[in-house]
Amino acid sequence: MASTEASITAGSNRSAFTLYAVAAILFTAICWIPTSIIASANGYILPSPFTFAELAQSGFNDSLHLIIALVFSIGTYGPFIAAIIAIYLEVGRNGISDLFRRMTKWRVDPKWYLWIIVLPFLIALPAFVIGIASGLTPLSTLTLAVPLNLLLPLILWQTFTSGLEEPGWRGYALPKLQEKYNAEKASVRLGVLWSAWHWPYIAYLTISTAVLPGDVPSELVGGLLAAAVIQTLFLHAVSTAGIAVIYTWLYNNTESVLIAILFHMSTNVVTAFLQTSPALTVITGIMPWVAAIILLRKYGRETLTGMNLQGTEDLQT
């Protein structure tokens, strides 16, 4: 990696990263857990790429629903806020200035902008196509997940909510982990942390959308829901570790947090449009690893740039 991250890495220490991880998860959990419970109790829809159109068209039920939605959305800023705190404690204002410089770095090879559009489709399309071909996603049921007049609002909303996780994940955490680990190991570790950060919402989503047979004894419902949550959390962690490799490839080759922000937005928007049957979740989870393995083979595990840390070509066998 080039010297642009020196202001962050200069004050490197393990406790700072631990502080970052705890602060990111804690801030978000404080926002997400209570709002998820209140939403479930009152039948409120929480904002997400999958509910955006429904919420935009139906509106909020009442003032409490609006407050819950706002607090839930604020929870997405946990990684960003934690990064600001950790960087300031480590290296002060210069580190924060460097982070914001990388957040606004838009002058990169145009091919990276193409990749952030194409890659989400390459990852999501296989499950979508298999769903149609197998009948699990009947053509007769296909509709636009988001009306075209809401596409731009969805893009902007995702850029400035979920996209702004990236100053934390790729702007701070990834460079910190790469001080100790190669790109592959840093990506997998970050992917697991990133997934754990999502767990309160994933648990809520799994429980709120679970469909159990009507003849299931009431005493078994809790156990079945717990099993479904555990399975979903595991699959999410595996999938997120794979997609974290893709983010590392994008970031290490551009040193642009903006590219990561736009890729995050693009992935969420495409996923919202190409929804498929829950029965194909495993395929959706595997596809990031298919892409990750290709990138690791082509660009090398050490930096994912085709070069090793000594600046020479990283040849893979």
Task: Name each region found by the language model.
Residues 2-162, 203-211, 232-235, 252, ...:
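Specific transmembrane helices
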Residues 17-20, 113, 172, 186-187, ...:
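Alpha-helical transmembrane segments and their helix-entry boundary regions
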Residues 126, 160, 173, 243-247:
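Hydrophobic/aromatic residues in alpha-helical transmembrane segments
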Residues 153, 169-170, 243:
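Functionally critical, cavity-lining and gating residues within the transmembrane helices
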Residues 164-196, 202-214, 248, 252-256:
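Membrane-interface helix/loop boundary segments of multi-pass membrane proteins
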Residues 166, 198, 264, 268:
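Histidine-centered divalent metal-coordination motifs
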Residues 188, 214-289:
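Functionally important transmembrane alpha-helices
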